[in-house]
């Protein structure tokens, strides 16, 4: 027997049963985004490597350690580790945002070479939102309201907490960086080798260290909010006032900086304690300088991304009321001479007149017992039975597989009407 080939570590398959939950979550995401008037865009999963180096920052963990990069002839390419850079690139290239506001969203796979664990994978999926051309804090608040509405739709709102911070302008971060480095240099004995490297290259990333002893020390470190420029301070204050006015609770987390270099002013995360170490289910903020940094005209921007794997895990963990649709509504069973054609014609008629129902024709041969067993296995609600007698009498036997009404015989012409009433009840 030939040796089997397995999926790459950290890149997972999704079974038919698991896909039902994924589809349910994705449909909720799409529905909420459409409610707010956002437009879908689609970008390639492979981009030029310099795009991410320029956008995310060469000293970030994502660019320096985690990207899947390869050479194609003389061009260096990368599987996208996140969606914002590619969306900005596309918006500049196609003129979507020149003198124009845009509210865009996308959904798809991303890739990072990380140590796989629950909620963190090498291929993972994100839904992302990017808004261009709106500078005021109202749009920051709208994105947070949008996500809050989605959490309610998913049944997870009571299990997530909103954390907010402002990281100000580049100048204010540089001033804060100097103060933070001066503080941390007094505690270098507590820093790991990786953290010592960050102290030189990207000291703000030390603020989200998992080292509990260092976290305690950082409670006494200078606070970024104390170094904000006046514009960023006013922007953040107005955002907090807006959230207070609409009843969105939040925590101000002075250590929240996000892991990508393009952010400025507002940053936020929705976190949960229900998934262990991988507690962030959504994160984002403003990146007002990124469009210009990538060659476009100066354009204020804000966005977020949510991890779909973590959302699916969280829904499984806390939403016990969810009722997923079955993969099949109607299963057409047929056995005997001259039953195949009527069965196929009936199935096609149902698909034409009731396209919202999922209709499966058996196709596998075997007696009625075998076919009913298969209908039960796929979770069908109704079986439509056509035997030799039904062919002669132009009737169909309808069997409720979920234990409701007893089976009954209907004229072939009445089946669609019956199903329309029975399945919408």
UniProtKB/Swiss-Prot annotation:
It is found in: Cytoplasm. It catalyses: tRNA(His) + L-histidine + ATP = L-histidyl-tRNA(His) + AMP + diphosphate + H(+). It holds the Pfam family HGTP_anticodon. GO terms for cellular component: cytoplasm. InterPro entries: aa-tRNA-synth_II, aa-tRNA-synth_II/BPL/LPL, Anticodon-bd, Anticodon-bd_dom_sf, His-tRNA-ligase, HisRS-like_core, HisRS/HisZ, HisRS_anticodon. One of its GO terms (biological process) is histidyl-tRNA aminoacylation. This is Histidine--tRNA ligase. It comes from Histophilus somni (strain 129Pt) (Haemophilus somnus).
